[in-house]
Design a protein with these regions (language model features):
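Loop-to-helix element that buttresses phosphate recognition and phosphoryl-transfer chemistry
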Residues: 11-65, 116-130
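Short, basic/glycine-rich phosphate-binding loops at helix/coil junctions
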Residues: 19, 102-116
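Phosphate-coordination/substrate-recognition cap region in phosphate-metabolizing enzymes
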Residues: 38-104
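Active-site-adjacent alpha-helix immediately C-terminal to a catalytic or transition-state-stabilizing loop
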Residues: 60, 130-183
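Conserved small/polar residues in nucleotide/adenosyl-binding loops
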Residues: 184-191
Length: 195
């Protein structure tokens, strides 16, 4: 059985400002750096052997802090990027028009075909983050990988691991630098989560 640890990046400036990030980026706050240091301490205790991270800046920085403590290299994987929020990226959530808020709600509240213009669907997100998780099966026996990703991306991944639809992530709300664990059986196509 392979244990895969899932970590959301530390708090960013835009998290604090309630801005939509998606695949756009903002730096970690001092609090976010501290959160990553706390995860790094725990990751070292867990014996993490591989760190696989989204290639966006906020996850890169979180992964760098963890890798330094664990003595691991980082593998960057664009499949772990956040949901592409299209034309709403970089916007303050409180400044959305009624139409824009409806797009956002349709997407995150479970409309199967929900999509923000120029963005991606929850199913597209689910397909790519699940493929990234599956690639952990190719790591050497005894590996303890840690994936560093984003709130909606990880929520979507955990939802599908639990057998829920991709858009059920809304009910899971993973906090900045939270740690979740997925147990993946190497022989059967079966994944279980212990959250």
């Amino acid at each position: 059985m392979l244990q895969v640890y899932l970590v959301r990046h530390g708090e960013t400036q835009w998290n604090a400002e309630r801005r939509i990030q998606g695949q756009s980026d903002s730096p970690l706050t001092a609090k976010g750096e501290q959160q990553a240091m706390q995860v790094a301490t725990r990751a070292k205790e867990l014996g993490i052997t591989h760190i696989i991270s989204s290639d966006l800046g906020r996850t890169r920085r979180t992964a760098e802090i963890i890798a330094q403590a664990c003595g691991c290299d980082i593998i960057f994987d664009s499949r772990l990027r956040e949901l592409n929020m299209g034309v709403l990226e970089k916007r303050h959530i409180d400044s959305l028009t009624e139409e824009e808020e409806n797009w956002r709600r349709q997407l995150v509240n479970g409309t199967v075909d929900g999509r923000i213009p120029e963005g991606e669907s929850m199913q597209e997100l689910s397909d790519r983050v699940n493929a990234a998780l599956e690639s952990c099966r190719d790591l050497p026996q005894g590996s303890r990988p840690l994936l560093v990703s984003h709130g909606i991306a990880l929520g979507c991944l955990v939802s599908t691991i639990l057998g829920l639809p991709a858009w059920a992530e809304r009910r899971l709300r993973l906090r900045n630098c939270s740690i979740s664990v997925s147990y993946t059986h190497l022989r059967a196509h079966e994944t279980k989560a212990n959250l």
